[in-house]
Amino acid sequence: MANAIVEKAKERMTHSHQSLAREFGSIRAGRANASLLDRIHVEYYGVETPLNQIASITIPEARVLLVTPFDKSSIKDIERALNASDLGITPASDGSVIRLVIPALTEETRRDLAKEVKKVGENAKVAIRNIRRDAMDEAKKQEKAKEITEDELKTLEKDIQKVTDDAVKHIDEMTANKEKELLEV
């Protein structure tokens, strides 16, 4: 029963890491990355549809994304969605494909994005600490209900803290790597 608490906390922390990785993937780093377009939804036959479900996204060059719609009639809808997005990238269409050239980041933009990365990383660490608190509360509840002994509670708290420390360390590494990637010229 006690290990279940640690495993559940570990699983929730893994989900936080995955969420952070997705969020970092959507932060533009001056080079083409298909995950930049993950948040783009296109109104396709009256339904909001994720872009990657109605078009293939390829990276022919380091700073170019190529969007090839499966249905050529949807190209105007895709262009409209890309223009309305907060990417800051103007799509260029030749009628069958849409080319997105990722502009080089200015030094100021790089610093702003690095601040954003730090903020997102801090939010992820807060989520990890909340998971730790929930796990600790569950362990204390079990000890109070006499399901585990006081010694088992102390061991469990140490295990939860170790898992938390590992998760926070991993988030720090992810954040540092993303910052380094952003600040590279």
Swiss-Prot record:
The keyword Protein biosynthesis applies. It comes from the Bacteria. Keywords: Cytoplasm, Protein biosynthesis. InterPro entries: Ribosome_recyc_fac (IPR002661), Ribosome_recyc_fac_dom (IPR023584), RRF_sf (IPR036191). Pfam families: RRF. One of its GO terms (biological process) is translational termination. One of its GO terms (molecular function) is ribosomal large subunit binding. Responsible for the release of ribosomes from messenger RNA at the termination of protein biosynthesis. May increase the efficiency of translation by recycling ribosomes from one round of translation to another. Belongs to the RRF family. This is Ribosome-recycling factor. It comes from Streptococcus sanguinis (strain SK36). The gene is frr.
